[in-house]
């Protein structure tokens, strides 16, 4: 990093904090609430600019608030209560996010992904689908979609799933048909395959609660603001019709809107068969991994009344260790899992403070006043559309969720007529589906964009078309189906 060119990334969050803190406190807010909001906004700016890793930004924000808690976190009335010790209370708040069940669910899901990777099961599943369905280009598109679909429930990093598992496999396919990157031959088959790679990643990120870290962040924000939540099964059932529709429609739609020149061939199945032969038969570790994953999915879908989803994940990780699918070193050395663990817990802590200080309720009432006179359905749809389109301005799904989701939740809470579970699920689906809009919206986007098979103009055009289709289908199913299963 060059200090002469990057110093502003460090100063910008501090400048935002100072500017907001110096502004007059809005009517209806207490001084400590406004100062807390100033630091919270500075953290969001830090997450967007990333002068340091996001987890560090969030931890610095928490440290500032906890140290200055008499002026930022607690009201004068709280401080005046007999026996109130702000030092103990601020510490309790600072680490509260780490006890949130959502944090442990996503950490467990990361370990599942490690098991998939170490055993080779994820790669084997993708290769089997490519071998069976790769004779026709359209079916190859479905093979990419189904591969993502199978991996998504237990791979909460869509970057690890899309860029780490799927992309390394499908990037080998176009050259088998002399379809080369940055060449006129790219449209032969490579462009279609690469577009299917990124669009399948975005679709599957919306289908499952554990398919993308920001989904779980949203649930944490929802729980901290309202004490309501969505279980793994709620999310799955609420998304079911839209999921089926998108899984079946998208490969065909891409085939029509971005047609490959080559329609069929045998090179891909032969290559996949060679790779599978090199892997050998299904080993005992893969079988154990497959059995545990099926068991976890069954309990996530049907066991919500008997065991918490996070406890399912925690127990399965313990079994993975006992069965030697993964080792303890795999857990302690998994930098991606610990990184998400820390920033997600920290962001949930910050969002909890935003609610505890009274900002969420104040902002919700402010929005409710400006939206009064409109039907709840119109308000809900308008908020979803605005939230969806604002994706163009964010290069991080985490920053996008943390910056805008609390405001969306506040608006819904301020209008009791808006069904919060339905609204939050629509917001969650919009996070994943909206990632298709730009070549920088989510982790795998730059990987596929930089493959040499997706020209800039094509990516933006297809992103807008597919993004619009996704938004329309989301609104329709959100209004017609989700209330049936969630209310």
Curated annotation (Swiss-Prot):
Record-level GO cellular component terms: plasma membrane
Catalytically driven reaction(s): (2R,3R)-tartrate(out) + succinate(in) = (2R,3R)-tartrate(in) + succinate(out)
Pfam families the record matches: Na_sulph_symp (PF00939)
Keywords tagged on the record: Antiport, Cell inner membrane, Cell membrane, Membrane, Transmembrane, Transmembrane helix, Transport
InterPro entries in the record: CitT-rel, SLC13A/DASS
Cell compartment(s), UniProt: Cell inner membrane
Domain of life: Bacteria
One example GO MF annotation: antiporter activity
Topology of this chain in the membrane: Multi-pass membrane protein
Family indicated by similarity: Belongs to the SLC13A/DASS transporter (TC 2.A.47) family. DIT1 subfamily.
Protein's job: Catalyzes the uptake of tartrate in exchange for intracellular succinate. Essential for anaerobic L-tartrate fermentation.
Protein name (Swiss-Prot/TrEMBL): L-tartrate/succinate antiporter
Gene name for this UniProt entry: ttdT
């Amino acid at each position: 990093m060059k200090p002469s060119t990057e110093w502003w990334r460090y100063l910008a969050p501090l400048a935002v904090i100072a500017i907001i803190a110096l502004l007059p406190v809005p009517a209806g807010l207490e001084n400590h609430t406004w100062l807390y909001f100033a630091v919270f906004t500075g953290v969001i700016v830090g997450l967007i600019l990333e002068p340091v890793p996001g987890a560090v930004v969030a931890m610095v924000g928490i440290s500032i608030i906890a140290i200055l808690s008499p002026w930022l976190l607690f009201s004068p009335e709280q401080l005046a209560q007999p026996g109130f010790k702000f030092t103990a209370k601020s510490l309790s708040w600072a680490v509260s996010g780490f006890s949130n069940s959502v944090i442990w669910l996503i950490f467990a899901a990361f370990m599942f992904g490690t098991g998939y990777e170490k055993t080779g099961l994820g790669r084997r599943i993708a290769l089997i689908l490519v071998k069976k369905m790769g004779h026709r280009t359209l079916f190859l598109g479905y093979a990419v979609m189904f591969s993502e679909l199978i991996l998504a429930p237990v791979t909460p990093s869509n970057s690890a799933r899309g860029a780490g598992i799927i992309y390394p496999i499908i990037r080998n396919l176009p050259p088998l048909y002399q379809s080369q990157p940055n060449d006129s031959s790219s449209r032969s088959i490579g462009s279609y395959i690469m577009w299917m790679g990124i669009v399948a990643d975005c679709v599957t990120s919306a289908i499952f609660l554990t398919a993308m870290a920001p989904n779980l962040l949203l649930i944490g924000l929802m729980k901290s603001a309202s004490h309501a939540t969505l279980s793994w099964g709620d999310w799955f059932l609420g998304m079911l019709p839209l999921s089926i529709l998108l899984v079946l429609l998208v490969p065909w739609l891409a085939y029509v809107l971005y047609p490959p020149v080559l329609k069929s061939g045998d090179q891909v199945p032969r290559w996949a068969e060679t790779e599978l032969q090199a892997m050998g038969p299904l080993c005992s570790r893969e079988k154990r991994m497959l059995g545990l994953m099926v068991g976890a999915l069954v309990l996530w879908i049907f066991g919500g009344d008997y065991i918490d989803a996070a406890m399912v994940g925690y127990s399965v990780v313990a079994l993975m260790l006992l069965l030697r699918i993964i080792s303890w070193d795999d857990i302690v050395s998994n930098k991606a899992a610990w990184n998400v663990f820390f920033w997600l817990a920290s962001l949930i802590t910050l969002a909890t403070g935003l609610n505890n200080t009274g900002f969420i309720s104040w902002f919700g009432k402010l929005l409710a006043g400006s939206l009064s006179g409109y039907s709840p359905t119109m308000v809900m749809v308008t908020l979803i559309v605005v939230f969806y389109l604002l994706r163009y301005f964010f290069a991080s799904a985490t920053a996008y969720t943390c910056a805008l989701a609390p405001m969306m939740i506040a608006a819904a809470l301020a209008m009791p007529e808006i069904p919060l579970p339905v609204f939050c699920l629509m917001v969650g689906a919009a996070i994943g589906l909206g990632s298709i809009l730009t070549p920088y919206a989510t982790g795998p986007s730059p990987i596929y964009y930089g493959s040499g098979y997706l020209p800039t103009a094509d990516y933006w055009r297809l992103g807008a078309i597919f993004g619009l289709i996704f938004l329309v289908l989301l609104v329709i199913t959100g209004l017609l189906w989700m209330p049936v299963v969630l209310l």
